């Protein structure tokens, strides 16, 4: 069975990618990060997801991105924006963008993949993300993959490392639809940037707005708790 390293956040996208990778038949080694994020409820959801998908091994890596700040997710001095209409969400890079986060996460995943002998890395970036987040764009992923094959021992030996982005051409609506077909239980996920202490989602941050809109377009109620 082929090994794969998967970046897992505890959100709907991660759950869908987990289901897709399991369907293909990969032995999944997952990795999550405690990076000082405001929405660390996602780490509690991760524990439920890895049980559901029989993950071979899961690692939670501690990184202090609060040392840099620069994002509403890692800096208490920057407020998480809230919206009342999904169509009012701005198209520029939002303050919830964490500088170089995917580069940092993928670098850890790459190192882990080398150690366990995996040549496949999965990340759940998609169309809705790439419109707002520069490190979710297809050209970024291709560039990182090229770097990975130049910078690793297995890469220079001709054993190609592949960064898989199975959601890259999907909208959030399509992701939810795909997950539902695969039997994903979205009750065990959270997307909110600013959940309450009991893990209820706020319902009007960027992540919540996009998620709620996706479930609405699939004519199904989002099963998680909202304030």
From Swiss-Prot:
Its EC number is 6.3.4.20. Binds 1 zinc ion per subunit. Pathway: Purine metabolism; 7-cyano-7-deazaguanine biosynthesis. SUPFAM superfamilies: Adenine nucleotide alpha hydrolases-like. Gene3D superfamilies: HUPs. Zn(2+) binds at residues 192, 202, 205, 208. ATP binds at residues 8-18. Its cofactor is Zn(2+). Coiled coil: none annotated. Catalyzes the ATP-dependent conversion of 7-carboxy-7-deazaguanine (CDG) to 7-cyano-7-deazaguanine (preQ(0)). This is 7-cyano-7-deazaguanine synthase. It comes from Rickettsia akari (strain Hartford).
């Amino acid at each position: 069975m082929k090994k794969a390293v998967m970046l897992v956040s505890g959100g709907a996208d991660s759950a869908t990618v987990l289901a897709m990778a399991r369907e293909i038949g990969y032995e999944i080694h997952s990795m999550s990060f405690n990076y000082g994020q405001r929405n660390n409820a996602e780490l509690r959801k991760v524990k439920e997801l890895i049980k559901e998908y029989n993950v071979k091994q899961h690692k939670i890596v501690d990184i202090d991105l609060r040392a840099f700040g620069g994002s509403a997710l890692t800096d208490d001095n920057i407020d998480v924006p809230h919206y009342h209409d999904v169509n009012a969400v701005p198209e520029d890079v939002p303050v919830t963008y964490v500088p170089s986060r995917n580069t940092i996460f993928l670098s850890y995943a790459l190192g882990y993949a080398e150690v366990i002998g995996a040549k496949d890395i999965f990340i759940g970036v998609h169309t809705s993300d790439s419109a707002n987040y520069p490190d979710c764009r297809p050209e970024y992923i291709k560039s990182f993959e090229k770097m990975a094959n130049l910078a690793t021992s297995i890469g220079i030996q001709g054993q190609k490392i592949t960064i898989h982005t199975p959601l890259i051409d999907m909208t959030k609506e399509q992701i939810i639809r795909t997950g539902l077909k695969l039997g994903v239980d979205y009750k065990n996920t959270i997307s909110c940037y600013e959940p309450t202490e009991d893990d209820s989602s706020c319902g009007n941050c960027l992540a919540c707005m996009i998620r709620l809109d996706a479930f609405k377009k699939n004519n199904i109620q989002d099963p998680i708790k909202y304030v």
